[in-house]
Design a protein with these regions (language model features):
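Start-of-helix register in tetratricopeptide repeats
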Residues: 23, 57, 91-92
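Preference for long, solvent-exposed alpha-helical segments and helix-linker "stalks"
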Residues: 84-202, 209-213, 240
Length: 317
């Protein structure tokens, strides 16, 4: 029995080390892609996929990097594997400029046909009208926020340009919320098996962008949906964090970012037990907080964060 336990412990440690190495390689490959070093990016994706090749998004990103590096053979290999592992966004696949140099290859038509046939099987039992409605809602929810992200690079937060965009966004959000509440009240939290992953994500995004009372009302429904596989645990974590912060408590997963009114710099809003945040994030399928905060050009230093936490809590009152 002791030998079995020892073997299991070694297996656990080996798996943990491999998982950490995989995440590190993927993160570095992503950085190299962003700096247009596509060959080095491809090399690191290749090393990562020798450890594990199950994540369809990572495989797709690897295909993009290898395509841009001119390695079409590897690009098709990873692209087809991503489809086998669950990549289903045909619209994005057809429009992705990273893959343009694959279009002239005979394998391209076969790859598109492969995904189309897979989608036919997957979508055979879809609620097509509901899917179309949710995809429209998703587009309305995201397109103005994309514009906001682009505009704030050029104009101040209190500029007329930003104020006008936020006014439109708030109006669209209120319309979308009425539609989503009707869907949730009549049909429940509809899973991706009925409308597809993209359309399913619209439910979360609209609730995430709604008022506190609405968020609290639909939180139990989303929790139940997660247990049934109809909603993402990571998305639920983001909703929980937002509610916790809005109600004056510390967040759990570190997903909510605030702006210091004095320095105008951004920071991770008050967080419980910062030392173990990555453990909690891993449990719900979220990546390391050090990678997450880079989206706001922040560097995660847990000791520095803990030393500043009492002051950050004052800012949030």
């Amino acid at each position: 029995m002791r030998n079995n336990i020892y073997t299991l412990l070694l297996l656990f440690l080996f798996t943990s080390v491999n998982a950490q190495e995989y995440s590190k390689l993927i993160s570095e490959a992503d950085k190299l892609y962003e700096t247009k070093n596509y060959k080095m990016s491809t090399d690191l994706y290749n090393k990562a996929f020798k450890i594990e090749s199950k994540n369809p998004n990572h495989l797709y990103n690897g295909a993009c990097a290898s395509s841009l590096a001119g390695n079409t053979k590897k690009a098709f290999k990873w692209l087809n594997l991503s489809i086998e592992k669950g990549w289903t966004n045909l619209k994005h696949l057809n429009s992705d400029t990273d893959l343009e140099n694959l279009h002239s290859k005979k394998e391209w038509g076969k790859t598109i046909e492969k995904l189309e046939k897979k989608l036919e099987l997957i979508e055979a039992n879809y609620d097509k009208p509901l899917q179309a409605e949710l995809l429209t809602i998703l587009d309305e929810d995201q397109k103005y926020r994309v514009q906001i992200n682009e505009t704030q690079k050029k104009f101040a937060q209190d500029s007329k340009e930003m104020q006008d965009l936020w006014k439109i966004t708030i109006q669209k959000d209120s319309i979308n919320l009425l539609k989503v509440k009707k869907i949730l009240d009549e049909k429940g939290w509809v899973g991706k098996d009925k409308v597809g992953a993209q359309a399913n994500s619209a439910l979360f995004l609209v609730i995430q962008h709604s008022d506190l009372e609405t968020q609290k009302k639909y939180l139990p429904m989303m929790k139940e949906a997660v247990t049934k596989g109809n909603a993402s645990p990571g998305s639920l974590a983001l909703l929980i964090d937002r509610i916790e912060i809005r109600e004056g408590r510390k967040q759990i997963y570190g997903s909510q970012i605030g702006t210091n009114p004095n320095t105008k710099t951004q920071y991770v809003l008050p967080l419980i037990d910062p030392d173990n945040v990555d453990k909690r994030r891993t449990e719900v399928g979220l990546g390391p907080i050090s990678d997450y905060v880079k989206n706001w050009n922040l560097i995660w230093d847990v000791e520095k964060y803990k030393s500043e936490l009492s002051e950050l809590e004052k800012l949030n009152k």
